[in-house]
């Protein structure tokens, strides 16, 4: 999250022409471009350049959210809270606080305009924090019911990744359980439609992990 660590939040960085060149190069390679961005001006610039997915976007305003919906661009946000990260300087802490304070507004606008929502985290780069990813899923309860959350993190995420077209490395459909699909499945000890926070304790509550048809964990 370079923009929090070093840059000003209002910096838009790349010119539209530069982003457009990246989009065309990606299209030539059969895939798409996503951008990590927070502020309305930068989000709008990216969309105008042909970007298909906005990562983060927490400082978005209503006009820009309406643009995302109209252009059918994906928005991949995270339910940030003040205790997510401990930044070393006061300036970095203040920038993180601004993002956290607008997270509620961003999710409410996304629901209002029925934007296509994906979900992901940056925690994969920090093995010690990887277990906290499932806690972030639970935080989505502030805006979505459990069915909406499960659909977002499975089926909807798979739809987003399918934008990679011919470069998609998976031989079957993702995010669904059906014959011929890519066999990634979890068996949970409990009903996550009733209690999404079961996922926050994977050691005890995830009984079976199947990835690409191979069993990686079996506590049955």
Where are each of the predicted segments found?
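Active-site core of metal-dependent hydrolases
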Residues: 1-105, 118, 123-124, 189
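Glycine-rich, flexible loop segments associated with nucleotide phosphate handling
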Residues: 13-19, 100, 169-180, 205-209
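His/Asp/Glu-enriched, well-ordered alpha-helical/loop segment
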Residues: 28, 32, 101-191
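Extracellular/periplasmic catalytic domains that process cell-envelope and extracellular macromolecules
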Residues: 37, 46, 67-69, 110-112, ...
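C-terminal cap of metal-dependent C-N hydrolases
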Residues: 167-168, 179-220
């Amino acid at each position: 999250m370079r923009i929090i660590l070093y840059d000003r939040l209002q910096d838009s960085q790349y010119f539209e022409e530069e982003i457009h060149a990246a989009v065309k190069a990606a299209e030539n390679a059969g895939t798409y471009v996503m951008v990590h961005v927070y502020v309305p001006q930068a989000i709008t610039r990216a969309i105008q350049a042909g970007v298909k997915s906005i990562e983060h976007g927490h400082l978005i305003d209503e006009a820009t959210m309406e643009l995302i919906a109209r252009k059918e661009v994906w928005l991949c946000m995270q339910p940030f809270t003040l205790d997510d990260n401990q930044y070393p300087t006061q300036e970095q802490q203040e920038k993180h606080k601004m993002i956290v304070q607008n997270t509620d507004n961003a999710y409410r606008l996304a629901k209002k305009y029925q934007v296509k929502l994906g979900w992901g985290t940056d925690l994969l780069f920090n093995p010690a924090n990887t277990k906290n990813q499932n806690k972030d899923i639970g935080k989505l309860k502030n805006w979505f019911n459990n069915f909406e959350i499960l659909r977002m993190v499975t089926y909807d995420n798979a739809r987003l990744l399918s934008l990679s077209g011919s470069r998609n490395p998976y031989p079957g459909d993702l995010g669904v359980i059906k014959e011929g699909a890519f066999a990634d499945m979890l068996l949970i000890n409990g009903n996550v439609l009733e209690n999404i926070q079961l996922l926050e304790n994977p050691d005890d509550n995830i009984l079976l992990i199947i990835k690409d048809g191979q069993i990686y964990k079996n506590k049955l």
